[in-house]
């Protein structure tokens, strides 16, 4: 995990094996070049794990390969990709929670992820602890809180990306915030 690049390599095939390559300059390639860094950043902030974030980027663009051409408004590509990123991350979080509950997966050490974005050792420890607390939350609360407080999204954007009402997004964020404050004492 150490030092992995968040962007998929240039050799990543976005076309399934055996299918003809549509060639450079396709809508998918343009979307990938323009938005992969943003998708990767959002995926890492939500999931907190490099390996899962890398896989999620590939999943988002595989899904995009099937749907991008159907979008009527080219300006909507970014918003659509963000919504897909959030939805796929939500699914991964739900699966992860079940895997932990069933004993298939253990707890994760967030120290490395925390070190990459921290200014001080205290901040790193706090961030790693927040991710551990988030791991114990329902996916919808974790997702809404992460979008708001880790990604800095506006409440309206959180609601849109979580496919819920503004009131519901606020409630999920507040519930997560109370849990974090209860366990840490601040944040």
Show where each model-derived region lies.
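Sigma70-family region 2
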Residues: 20-22, 61-77, 95-97
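A short, charge-rich alpha-helical start-of-domain segment used by transcription regulators
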Residues: 8, 17-41, 51-54, 65, ...
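Internal acidic/polar
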Residues: 8-14, 99-127, 131
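A short pre-motif secondary-structure segment
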Residues: 144-148
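Arg/Lys-rich amphipathic alpha helix in sigma70-family domain 2
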Residues: 69-72, 83-104, 123
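Structural recognition of an alpha-helix C-terminal capping motif at a helix-to-coil junction
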Residues: 41, 55-62, 66, 75-87
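DNA-recognition helix of helix-turn-helix
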Residues: 86, 90, 156, 162-187
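C-terminal flanking helix
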Residues: 36, 40, 61, 138, ...
């Amino acid at each position: 995990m150490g030092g992995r690049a968040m962007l998929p390599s240039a050799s990543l095939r976005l076309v399934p094996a055996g299918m003809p390559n549509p060639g450079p300059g396709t809508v998918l390639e343009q979307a990938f070049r323009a938005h992969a860094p943003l998708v990767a950043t959002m995926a890492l902030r939500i999931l907190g794990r490099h390996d899962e974030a890398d896989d999620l980027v590939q999943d988002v663009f595989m899904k995009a390969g099937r749907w991008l051409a159907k979008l009527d408004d080219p300006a909507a590509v970014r918003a659509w990709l963000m919504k897909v990123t959030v939805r796929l991350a939500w699914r991964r979080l739900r699966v992860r929670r079940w895997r932990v509950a069933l004993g298939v997966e253990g707890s994760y050490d967030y120290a490395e992820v925390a070190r990459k974005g921290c200014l001080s050792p205290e901040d790193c420890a706090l961030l790693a602890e927040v991710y551990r607390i988030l791991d114990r939350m329902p996916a919808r609360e974790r997702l809404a809180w992460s979008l708001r407080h880790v990604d800095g999204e506006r409440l309206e954007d959180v609601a849109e990306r979580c496919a819920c009402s503004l009131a519901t997004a606020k409630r999920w964020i507040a519930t997560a915030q109370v849990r974090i404050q209860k366990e840490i004492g601040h944040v």
